[in-house]
Amino acid sequence: MGSLYYSGSRMVRKDEVSCKLVMGDDKKTVVYAVRIGDGPIMQKVYEEYEKFFLTDVKDMVPEKFTIFPKKKLLQSKKTFFEKRRLWIQDVCQHLVDNQTKSEDVCRFFHIEAPDDDDNTVDLGPSERKTATANDFDFLTTIGKGSFGRVYQVRHKETKKIYAMKVLSKEHIRKKNEVKHVMAERNVLINNFKHPFLVSLHFSFQNKEKLYFVLDHLNGGELFSHLQREKHFTESRSRFYAAEIACALGYLHEKNIIYRDLKPENLLLDDKGYLVLTDFGLCKEDMQGSKTTSTFCGTPEYLAPEIILKKPYDKTVDWWCLGSVLYEMIFGLPPFYSKDHNEMYDKIINQPLRLKHTISVPCTELITGLLQKDRSKRLGHKNDFRDIQDHPFFLPVDWDKLLNRELKAPFIPKVKNAMDISNISKEFVEIQIDPASLAPQQLAVTHRDHDFENFTFVDTNRVLV
């Protein structure tokens, strides 16, 4: 028998199956809602349960379950539906009690198959302190990427709002991106609460997915604000560029190259401060002038040396800063073209052209950052210090900026932590399937060598 928990005054098995009748969205279709313990609810029409029974599990259950409920003459619909409900509940209970090693059963119910003892791994005391997907309510889709989606979630006990990034292990393996995901995890763990880098609260996994629980930033992407306003003032652009430079300088101190700076990876918080997110393309262990040669990044912001497949160093991030600063002021990246090959040719060969509508310090900064020869690029000698000391940033009080004591030039309209008005409708309209996102954990965490040591808990923010 499974473990017990209290529901009101009744003692309930943790893996007890309940089935209820509900009406579908069309108010006509009868739907059977199955729930295991206090887990997420799975809603399907009767025919789906019957098909699953006939095609996948018929041989796993006693003969009494092979007799399907049939409507008798003069029998009321209510009685007929109730018979179906009881049949579904009893069959599902039998399968959950006896067949959780079956892949078909686990897939249908979105539960974890128990592993043999020699396949389990003790992840230490922090494993118990960390969260699982079942500790959260999934509220809204707020982002989408190559390997998964980002959700606004609410912790059931504390009611705190977070962003949860959920990635598919299968997709990550197919694209050979395991190293990048683990690098992202390592960078997030070592952020040490930098004011302009998103913080990780928890990371955990199950058989199919990886989960990052992060700060929820609902002031909107810099990209969205830039699209709406076309361009920013020089003063506002300076504020954002200073924050970005601080974040990049901090990563460089930790021997990390970011490699994917772009407006889509910069989020505003409710106070109007920028926060750098998405560390999937970070390169670790880049001490001093050490170089690497992996071709990666976003086309519009690639430095010439990356396009030419030459060795590159930390100065690629300063090229990206120049590109983003240019875009904030003029509305498009500096060498933009819809044709990538044409754009690459411009990045490599075309001289930088700047309008005379900006100040001399701004012109000099962008020119220095977008120097095609990385050995002459601003930041090559003293990294962040070169950027910080540039005349363009003379109005910036760096200590007050890092302490978040400066008033932001723009404060987004945010009502509360759950406000999603600054999130793209493209994401918000994506339907959520809680049962697949938070499968019932019927066993200890299984060993996964590809993602070993992925699990993390910020001990200063333990939830449970």
From Swiss-Prot:
Keywords assigned by UniProt, alphabetized: ATP-binding, Cell membrane, Cytoplasm, Developmental protein, Kinase, Magnesium, Membrane, Metal-binding, Nucleotide-binding, Nucleus, Phosphoprotein, Serine/threonine-protein kinase, Stress response, Transferase
Positions of the catalytic residues: D260
Cofactor: Mg(2+)
Name of a matching Pfam family: Pkinase
Known role: Acts downstream of PI3 kinase age-1 and kinase pdk-1 in the daf-2/insulin receptor-like transduction pathway. Essential role in regulating development, stress response, and longevity. Phosphorylates Forkhead-related daf-16 and the longevity-promoting skn-1 transcription factors, which inhibits their entry into the nucleus and antagonizes their function. Plays a role in the intracellular trafficking of proteins such as mig-14 to the cell membrane, and this may be through positively regulating ceramide synthesis. Acts downstream of rict-1 to regulate fat storage, size, and development.
The protein's assembly and partners: Interacts with pdk-1, akt-1, akt-2 and daf-16. Part of a complex containing sgk-1, akt-1 and akt-2. Interacts with let-92 phosphatase regulatory subunit pptr-1.
Name of the molecule in the record: Serine/threonine-protein kinase sgk-1
Organism for this UniProt entry: Caenorhabditis briggsae
Gene name of the encoded protein: sgk-1
